[in-house]
């Protein structure tokens, strides 16, 4: 069954233009890292944002994930906040419903992901933390209740990103949680320039936040859903092992084209991990063989965020990993069968990212021309970077890389992304229902940003409602003229964040879609639609 939810007035080609609208839309949020002056490592690594339709009314709502109270902090306690989207007219209105929704998570929040874990038709939340993680179960009444302890996913270690996916294709959502290091406020160390030590006065400006190699990495966790929304730790039995790396980003998707979900983890100063799904929830470690574990010189980089999308238009899913300053961001182009080629230099992504420390990353068709562009959120971890001998400034401009076709990019400096802060998590969704993707950026201990996409062009938006299974992991293929585009629905990506579950396609000036194929996760039959008008929002039910 196909439902047409509406259309917007966009037509013709598009020149990229964004406008910052956080106050105008009622999305004022300032991240609070709980800074005490003691330079606790966790202070500089948060926070994330989740864009998801928690109330099932057809538009995406916004969850900002805040920090928490650390020893020595004396301000107001930080608090994660949920904003309900009351879209309508040219200017949407967001309402803070944190209290009404029963979101009383009071841990030190890092990131999150949203998915229907118990199969009741609404989206639940998983929030990662420095401390116990929490699963917030959506009651379907506009309220949530805590279920992390009950469902056995309340990992007490320092977790970063998380992602939902049906890793065994049994119809329910499993959960992968990325853990970072064993840092705590009790094993806190003095870190500064080479040769400095704790005898140096902090007031001399010599102290910085510690890098991850000062601590031990912590093993990630894979939780298998039992079909009722309860979870079992399946990390070891699935073949993932118990290796302890300093992980930050994760995506779940089909990396080798065999229809089984695979896992990719961005690690900080450790080799990135690629686990190939071989069936029934089992994995094989293909990290080294894949070509996506190191840079082209065989060096492990400081991976932060990760995106998985078809960036060169060949139908295969490519990887982008954001890295530390002087490393450049990585573009691993899929060569098929789970093999990747490092094409960051020929793609034009390396040199412009050399001086930046990048975190969030999102693939979106910003100009609606039919190929995917890239947004990258930048910001250093050291407020005194120059003083302690590190490259770059603390506040850094974010970047939009326009896709010139076939996976080659150029930086656009004139698109309205003018605010310079210290960015971390980022996500995209059509928040005002006008057919293009808007952006939300969380800045460390600073106000967040919301950018309305003002680009004009034709488009198609596809939402899914699949009876008996989640839409997460579905593949949607669109043919318009001689161009074929592919999207996968994903619950968790970028850095500590999640973007919309609705698939968006830019059509340029095209007025019709010749063919749309939806391939649900697992063995279900594909859904085929033909001759669709452009600039429509479709909700496909089965």
Model-found features: residue ranges?
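Beta-propeller blade signature
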Residues: 80-85, 219-225, 276, 333, ...
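Beta-propeller blade termini
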Residues: 38, 46-56, 84, 108-119, ...
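Gly/Ser/Thr/Pro-enriched helix-cap/hinge segments flanking short amphipathic alpha-helices
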Residues: 11-17, 25, 35-36, 348-351, ...
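Asp-box/WD-like beta-propeller blade repeats and closely related beta-sheet repeat scaffolds
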Residues: 97-114, 127-167, 177-213, 218-219, ...
